[in-house]
């Protein structure tokens, strides 16, 4: 039995030896009385264990000389001596200063630290061990600022990286640790604290003024730069409260630029909230604003909402739009454009964003830039237009696609005649064709068919500029009516058409028309015209608004839409606050059966002498008078599309009864004039001479397979009935809200019968676009199709502009 016992003990010893020779084990000192003492230092003794042929290091407990701990058991005497020397050098300050060290778990941790970090001082080890009493030992205090280790870091660096605020206090208060000492990477304790997770450590460091707060490491980063790079928003806040400087140059500029480069929105917002001037700061290297560094739509939108200059240029002359196009960031491009970025600004070498988009072969981006006003024939410093650059693209398929795209809006890819370009470079060029009535005298400006500048020479020829600028003071002898269809976000099509008319005429829409009628989205635009909001501004507003309003699933929350309307028109603005032009919005009174059409007016409703359709019902409240009607509520009521938004009180969307408000508007004008005559004010009545009706785009006609609804007799017929009911329901809704077809035919016929010039402008769209579409690419494509429509119908636009400008 003794043999087997010794065998088990031997196997156990061997197993422990091979498993972990440095496993700390509590022992009795008496067990080693028969072993030879090889070396002794203080409480540490190295024994030679002859029976096991090992060298054991024993730490005798200072509190009890009969007990101790075996720190290691090694087979090699040389290894044992080396480790004994290291242990005897590092251990004494710990067991001399704290009884907590005299536990197996603590000693094991300390042993592992000593072996893992042989270059560390006792103070470094004390930081990782985390026992506060140890920092009162004189030897640990003496090494508080030591950098003698592989990283060159001080114990304070380690405490900050570890995030141990209690140890940090011990180092600063008792050991007088310096906070501006740098490691091998040039980093101070502040850099280490930023990389940790405990902001309290950073707060403690920041209580005392130190150059380390703004120290730049070898990568050129201050602690604030590093916090922004890592997305540590709370660390950024603490650093700023500790007066960290925001104007220290780093590899990517100032800290705000670093936050933008790494798309750390929270950090950028924190810097701007603490120092609003940082939103306009330009980095010394590139002269770029924070907006130039925006890599996604969210970051760009955040800056622009806080007032960042959208057209700020870098040292090279490029705007943020140039950079976004060069980087193929379509989402950024759309945000910049919708916040008013100039799509035609020349940048480095005179290249506009469109020049750069052509070179990137990005069709969506090209369309977006042209839709937002980029000129296809503006030359750069080398005399190259975007269209000419498209003709030079090496890839045949790409070249053909680009040229085909640009030709649809009248772009000329030939090299233009430009002043300042050498004659040998432009001798083969021919003058660009001008789509105007007088082709013998092309204007001295570059052509932009998309913005209808080909029409501007005509309007200038007919009216000098000083007359155009004073048109609002002229007395027209006839009235002009503008009618705007409903269609949700497709109101962008109306905006694009109005921009074209304004560009061609040189006159704001408000001054071209005496009456404006609108339904739903058309009603919102009618109010925008009334309140002198530019259509370019409204285009951006619509792109921004859709993301705020159309969130989640239908029906959408009404709050965001109402907040948008209040923001744009004012919370307390009344309909009658602005009197010209006269505006009417359609709404549907749904508190009665059958429902009735209601017009929200900025003038008193005309008195109509005719028998009422229904007997008066005392349970039905009369509508609010125009003088008391809030503008935003009128817009909300006109746009309360069923299934998209909840009703606004008793009002539903006006599109249910008048999605194309032309005939209703003409009827209203007739009744208004008749009322004026009855009241003896016939001299104020002016005959309606022009009606302009703008649509939100015609959806393509598609075949319908079945609208049959019947009692099914089998599962197949049930499926057929369900499908038929769905198609029939869609057809009923489309028929009720159809703004084209017979509605247009009736309006045109009535106008012709009474001698009114009628213009219906409504582009054919390539696909059916929903009222709540939020995809930028889809909407840009719809506006592109609108631009193509404008170019193809330029003669009709010419005629319209001529008539609108006539007195």
Curated annotation (Swiss-Prot):
Record comment regarding domains: Has two putative calmodulin binding domains, the 1-9-14 and IQ motifs. One calmodulin molecule interacts with PLA2G6 dimer, likely through 1-9-14 motif on each monomer. Binds calmodulin in a calcium-dependent way.
Function: Calcium-independent phospholipase involved in phospholipid remodeling with implications in cellular membrane homeostasis, mitochondrial integrity and signal transduction. Hydrolyzes the ester bond of the fatty acyl group attached at sn-1 or sn-2 position of phospholipids (phospholipase A1 and A2 activity respectively), producing lysophospholipids that are used in deacylation-reacylation cycles.
Source species taxonomy: Eukaryota, Metazoa, Chordata, Craniata, Vertebrata
Compartments where located: Cytoplasm; Cell membrane; Mitochondrion; Cell projection, Pseudopodium
Activity regulation statement: Activated by ATP. Inhibited by calcium-activated calmodulin. Inhibited by bromoenol lactone (BEL).
EC code(s) of this entry: 3.1.1.4, 3.1.1.5, 3.1.2.2
PROSITE patterns (alphabetical): ANK_REP_REGION, ANK_REPEAT, PNPLA
Protein name according to UniProt: 85/88 kDa calcium-independent phospholipase A2
PANTHER family cross-referenced by the UniProt entry: 85_88 KDA CALCIUM-INDEPENDENT PHOSPHOLIPASE A2 (PTHR24139:SF34), CALCIUM-INDEPENDENT PHOSPHOLIPASE A2 (PTHR24139)
UniProt-annotated stretches for the region Calmodulin-binding (IQ motif): 749-760
Domain PNPLA: 482-666
Motif DGA/G, residue numbers: 653-655
UniProt subunit comment: Homodimer formed by catalytic domains tightly interacting through a large hydrophobic interface. The contact area involves 3 alpha helices, several loops and a part of the beta sheet from each monomer. Both active sites of the dimer are in close proximity adopting an open conformation that provide sufficient space for phospholipid access while favoring cooperativity in deacylation-reacylation reactions. Each monomer has 9 ankyrin repeats stacked side-by-side in an elongated structure oriented outwards from the catalytic core.
Enzyme class: hydrolase
